[in-house]
Amino acid sequence: MSSGEERLAALRADPSRAGIFSDFDGTLAPIVDDPEQSRPVEGAVDVLAALARAYARVGVVSGRPAGFLLEHLGPDPEAARDLTDAEHGKLLLAGLYGLEVVQDGEVVATDEARRWGPVLDEAIARLKEEAPEGVSVEGKGFTVVLHFRRHPELADEARAVAEREAERSDLEMGEGRQSFELRPPLPTSKGTVVADAAARLSAVCFLGDDHGDLTAFDALDDLAESGATTLRVGVRSEEAPDELLDRADLLVDGPTEVVQLLRSLIPDDG
């Protein structure tokens, strides 16, 4: 299969053997200046719940803390618990690139991530002292982000501060949308999360809009080599990286169109 429509048809054909995975920021939620004010677009929560009841696996894989995802993507606390519990296990909420997941309605961090907690705490404290005025420091528990969206002219200064702290703390630095992120040097990414969750599925879709989503595209490429039908959906924006848009099998314009696409995947009896 080559076209996006054909791959969508493969997902719809047998939901019991298919999985749908998505990024959060820029995909299910619009990009905003203050990350704490980000919320999913209208319809996103309901469509995820409907898909989770129909498909073998549905997930949101994000750089956000898993607790944030649980708070804002659960239809309500009890429904979120039901959809993420060990018995059902269909709705995967993976935060911090897989360093945290929601299990039985509770956030659980990996042992490896917990060992890096003190290092991150010290790094966050130093960065808050050293970051130039206009660059905000967001501690996420097991990662820390320097945001310069409101002052793009400070990008070089923010990079220098992030690089210095990464070297000092043995953390890995990644570049995001008008931000730099430091996280533990662990072999965990959106790609590893998707690869593990989708290993036994016959059709898999991932939707994303940023550099961090490319590892999930890589995972889908590996699954395709193993015989799975895969669909890489890129979400267009002024800040979406060219590589992601070039590799996408299907392109949509923003979170509202993402929800429309996801709604089209709900079975008629869903």
Please identify what each model-predicted range represents.
Residues 18-20, 91, 204:
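The start of beta-strands in P-loop NTPase/AAA+ ATPase cores
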Residues 27, 66, 212:
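Conserved Rossmann-like nucleotide-cofactor binding loop
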Residues 15, 191-270:
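Mg2+-dependent phosphoryl-transfer enzymes with acidic/Ser/Thr/Gly-rich catalytic loops
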Residues 39-136:
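Active-site phosphate-binding/coordination module
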Residues 11, 51, 76, 127-130, ...:
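Hydrophobic helix-cap positions at the C-terminus of alpha-helices
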Residues 1-24, 28-36, 43-46, 50-53, ...:
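Non-catalytic pre-domain segments flanking phosphatase-related domains
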Residues 130, 134-220, 228-229:
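Conserved acidic, metal-coordinating active-site core of Asp-based
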Residues 76-79, 109-112, 154-155, 192, ...:
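Short, hinge-like loop/turn segments at secondary-structure boundaries
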